[in-house]
Structure formats: structure tokens, C-alpha cells
Amino acid sequence: YHIKTRESGFEIKMLPTWRPDKAMAVEVPADFRSYVEKLAEVSGVIISNFDDMIAALRKRHDFFAEQGCRLSDHGIEEFYAEDYTDAEIKAIFNKVYGGAELTKEEILKFKSAMLVIFGEMDWEKGWTQQFHYGAIRNNNTKMFKLLGADTGFDSIGEFTTAKAMAKFLDRLNTNGKLTKTILYNLNPCANEVIATMLGNFQDGSIPGKIQFGSGWWFLDQKDGMEKQ
């Protein structure tokens, strides 16, 4: 629809946002494999290993850029910053793509790697990366089975994310690949955490390189905005 709207001569710009959450959603092997197969189809890349998946994601990243995209958006429970090796991530991909369930440690390592890769992609194109974090989802099993995901049974989560957030941002910054960033918390107890975190990674290259996002979801109301 973005392409059709642009080609129609519509004067208002309607630009897409890159939202690759499913590429790191490895909790359910069948769902992940289904996503990878769809990614292969739309990208035209045959995917049989981790490097293939990244190549396909880069191709889609390029496509979104061609459509005017300048923002990525990542919906995460918390920040992930586990230590990992390339060999570990490739092995984890092979395991989950083959249908085997991952351990909690493997899930966290994979998510940590993907966040860094996405951040590097955005830096290469000068995009801004956004993170909406802090929700716990699908809390009512009965209603989840009846209606599915995203049907009103999500709430504010309570996570200890300051260290992981700092480590993630520092990884990109240390490698000279920390792009413009906006952080949106869902739990108001993290307001001061983010407000102070911003100052750690401002580098003077542009005003407000790392920013506190506006009140989101449950905080998108008068009290939430004033506290922020």
C-alpha cells in the first residue's frame, strides 16, 4: 500500500517502519520456521543456514529503505546482551530451524545477537532504531486459546533491564556503530533509568542522538506523559 499510495501521486508521505521482531522470536520452533520460510519467499533468498537468513533480512532492509523507511522498531520484553560467539548463533539457528526447542540460555543468546545485527544494519543506513520494551503478553491462557495474541490481555511487566540496556548500547558504541536511538519504556519505574542512560551515549555528533520516547501504551495518558 505504501508503494501504491506513492505511485498514485498522494502528496502526504506515508512511509513504512522496519519491524523484524519475528526474526528473533525463537521460542516456538514451528512458528520461527514458518517465518523463515515466508522470509525466503518474499526476499527470493534460499535459506538453509543463519548466514542465509541474515542475507535475506538485509535484502528486505534494502527494500524498506527504497520505500522511504528511515526507522526500525523493535518490540521486546527486555534488552538482551548475553555474551555469544558466531559459531554458537549459527548452531542455535540450525537447532531451532530443525524443529528442536531451545534452552533459555540459547534463546537469550540468539536474541542478543539479532539485536546487534539489526542495530548495525540501521547504522549503515543512518536510520533511527526504536525500542518499545517492558510488556508481558498473552497472560490469560484461556483467552489466548480462544482469541489468539494481541487481543487485550497484555500488561506492564517488571524487568531489571538497566545493565542489559547499557551493555547492548555499549556494544554498538564500542564498535562505532551506535545509530540514533529512541527508548520507550512501558513501566514508569524505568523513567529515571532511561533519563540517566541517555547521557552515557550522547557523542555530540547530532543533538539528542539517544532519546527518551514519548509515553507509550499504558503511559499514553496525562499522568504518564507528565511523569515522563
Report the location of each language-model feature.
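Short, conserved secondary-structure transition motifs
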Residues: 22-25, 217-221
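Short beta->alpha connector loops
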Residues: 187-189, 218
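Histidine/acidic residue-rich metal-binding segments in metalloenzymes
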Residues: 1-12, 34-180, 189-207, 224-227
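Short amphipathic
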Residues: 18-20
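His/Asp/Glu-rich acidic catalytic environments and adjacent acidic regulatory segments
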Residues: 15
